[in-house]
């Protein structure tokens, strides 16, 4: 792997991949060899009190290496990719200021993308305009908004399925609010250079091995007290309907606690939905050409060599 010796941007390492691939364990192991700190890029680990079901680092792992962007907000608070970008970049710059190497560890592709490349500067959503657009779809029939998008932003329309109403509405919303095509804004943003020099490593394994690890981890979470964690959250007043409680592992056990689902069925659904989530993560990351894929186990020496070459490329 050849790195650019003339690139003077500050270096960061990204360690990504599907859930249960062993990212945290590798980051902790790297901390034994390198002066690193971890920035968690996990959309659920930002929530306080949700420890077991989000597979947060253990107390031993947290003691081994400083972690950032964990336990940031309560489960009933809103947290967006924009929030993550702002706080994450602050953490990166703080770590770099201490002459340490930031390692971004996680499987939330959108958060990683926002951190590295920022977010498109578009207006916030307008609930009144959105409601007007949705009423037009109801009044004039299914496909009305998609046809409208084909006229005002044909490039975006070509990318979207005709039934993806959320993104269709967003495209029309942006056009109405700033008189710019969202596809043009996306193209302009894609051409911008990241403020960081990035080495992106992806952990992978065979699908069979990954699914086996996922199934086993679900059982381990239950043994560690995931059902009790869900009961605790409900007793603290976090509603079953709040966004964090509707994520995998929590929504199923909420239904079990409420008597609507047997434990066996809850486990089956958690395992199934986690496998599906891992598949979606891989689909996202497989579109990122810069990722160097590594086997989750047995390539530690290669990881160290890659990071060493990357750091001293500048």
From Swiss-Prot:
A single GO BP: tRNA modification
Keyword check for Nucleotide-binding: yes
Documented EC number(s): 2.5.1.75
Top-tier EC class: transferase
Chain spans, region Interaction with substrate tRNA: 42-45
Cofactor(s) this protein cannot do without: Mg(2+)
One annotated GO molecular function: ATP binding
InterPro entries the record matches: Dimethylallyltransferase (IPR039657), IPT (IPR018022), P-loop_NTPase (IPR027417)
Binding-site residues for ATP, renumbered to this chain: 17-24
Reaction it catalyzes: adenosine(37) in tRNA + dimethylallyl diphosphate = N(6)-dimethylallyladenosine(37) in tRNA + diphosphate
Gene3D superfamilies (alphabetical): 1.10.20.140, P-loop containing nucleotide triphosphate hydrolases (3.40.50.300)
Entry binding sites for substrate: 19-24
Residues the UniProt record annotates as site (Interaction with substrate tRNA): 108, 130
UniProt keyword annotations, A-Z: ATP-binding, Magnesium, Nucleotide-binding, Transferase, tRNA processing
Pfam families per record: IPPT
Self-association state and partner proteins as the record states: Monomer.
Matches recorded under HAMAP family: IPP_trans
Entry function: Catalyzes the transfer of a dimethylallyl group onto the adenine at position 37 in tRNAs that read codons beginning with uridine, leading to the formation of N6-(dimethylallyl)adenosine (i(6)A).
Family to which the UniProt record says this protein belongs: Belongs to the IPP transferase family.
Name recorded for this polypeptide: tRNA dimethylallyltransferase 1
